[in-house]
């Protein structure tokens, strides 16, 4: 590790204190909640629900052509 001067060390300590203050939760709890949130949003997500893409006027209708 390279030599650090005092301001760099202070910034590093400040950053570590900031990270330590974050509220953390167990992955075993948050991952199922995230999956449920994603699954609940599928009917409203135009990228996952092709019927919603049909109503979007900005979607390109033509396919790409390779020259």
Swiss-Prot record:
The annotated topology with respect to the bilayer is: Lipid-anchor
- The protein's gene is named Gng13
Q: Which PANTHER family match?
A: GUANINE NUCLEOTIDE-BINDING PROTEIN G I /G S /G O GAMMA-13 SUBUNIT, GUANINE NUCLEOTIDE-BINDING PROTEIN G(I)_G(S)_G(O) SUBUNIT GAMMA-13
This entry carries the following GO cellular component terms, namely: dendrite; heterotrimeric G-protein complex; membrane; plasma membrane; synapse
Which organism encodes this protein? Mus musculus (Mouse)
Q: What is this protein's name?
A: Guanine nucleotide-binding protein G(I)/G(S)/G(O) subunit gamma-13
Q: What does the UniProt function comment say about this protein?
A: Guanine nucleotide-binding proteins (G proteins) are involved as a modulator or transducer in various transmembrane signaling systems. The beta and gamma chains are required for the GTPase activity, for replacement of GDP by GTP, and for G protein-effector interaction.
Please name the GO terms of the biological process aspect recorded for this protein, alphabetically.
Answer: phospholipase C-activating G protein-coupled receptor signaling pathway; sensory perception of taste
Positions of S-farnesyl cysteine lipidation: 64
């Amino acid at each position: 590790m390279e030599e650090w001067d005092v301001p760099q060390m202070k910034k590093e300590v400040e950053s570590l204190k900031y990270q330590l203050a974050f509220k953390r939760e167990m992955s075993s709890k948050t991952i199922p909640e995230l999956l449920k949130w994603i699954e609940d949003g599928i009917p409203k997500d135009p990228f996952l629900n092709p019927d919603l893409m049909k109503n979007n006027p900005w979607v390109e209708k033509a396919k790409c052509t390779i020259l």
